[in-house]
Amino acid sequence: EDIDEDDIESLLIQQIEFCSTLILNKTDTVSPEQIAELKAIVRSLQKDAVIVEAQNGEVPMEELLDTDRFDFMRAYNSAAWIEAMEHPEEHDDPEVLEYDIETFVYSRRKPFDLKKFTDFVEQEWPDEVIRVKGPLWQTGDPDMCYMFEQAGHQMRLMENGLFVDSAPEGEKQKIIDENPEIMQIWDDETGDRMTSLCIIGRHMDKDALIASLDACLTDWH
């Protein structure tokens, strides 16, 4: 079965996010500056993996076997977008910023008009954006939390469970009692309904992107 180029690009990005060791092969065919630039791009996606340079696929065995590097939960949580969501003010790495790679979190308490958002994503989404992931709120189904994800040129919007605030009052309070951290993002008007997208890009116009996303928002109620 043929695999679409966009699918390969998306798969590679997700593999980088979930790895503990990453091999950069054929480093003898590019300049030191290009290697440094590539490492910066990798670090914008994955903060913790050990990066090993190689030529002709020759990698020391000690870098591959019995390294004790892989830990499932650590790998699961090592993607740079997760760190940025948890610590939105602490993710600017000088190594990454040097190559004009920027990470920011777009958070809003207004829902998206789904048609406007879809039109923007399909027709005007900037190529400079490398990766996006996070919960999204839209008026077509205001009680449902959606997950929006972009990796390379592939984009997906999928259901990710109901917002807690949409539950009946008794059930809502039970969920909050069992998960008190929810109150850290709770709003008196919208509850836990919100959009919070981690956006990673290179040479992107952050202000223009924010303005375009804001133009897709609408009022609720």
Question: Could you describe each region identified by the protein language model?
Answer:
Residues 1-189, 195, 204-206, 215-221:
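C-terminal accessory "lid"/substrate-recognition subdomains
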Residues 210:
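Short, surface-exposed ligand- or partner-binding patches at beta-edge/loop junctions that are enriched
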